[in-house]
Amino acid sequence: MARWSKTIAAAAILTVVLLVVAGCSSRSLTLDETKWQLAEWTVSSLKPSDFTITAEFANGQISGNGGVNGYSGPYKAGPGTAFAAGPLAGTLLAGPEPATRAESIYQTLLGQAKSYKVADGKLTLYDQGGNESLIYEQATR
């Protein structure tokens, strides 16, 4: 009888451990129906907060404002933390030099993003080397 109790207890513990591990496995976090405002980037002395740079995700599409022009195109998040955006299309408005330079930097970094993480109200995109490149804060709808 004691042997069966130990077997049942071991099976119960194993089940709990497997459920915990399965819950911690890498799953794709959906970005659909979220909107973000760019807060930081790691490659320029220009401050993203000086411009309106946004990203909105819905139905497999990313759209937003790059600082001067609107943009849109397909994106893919997953499997796991994999990320890809593009090809992107945009309007062709002219703008002041700092804003057009910021937009160019943004478009380049967005196109180079290979993975992502959502945590603490922030969306972080990483380049191929795993370096943070674009850091957004969740925007209100």
Describe every region a protein language model picked out.
Residues 2-141:
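Lipid interaction determinants
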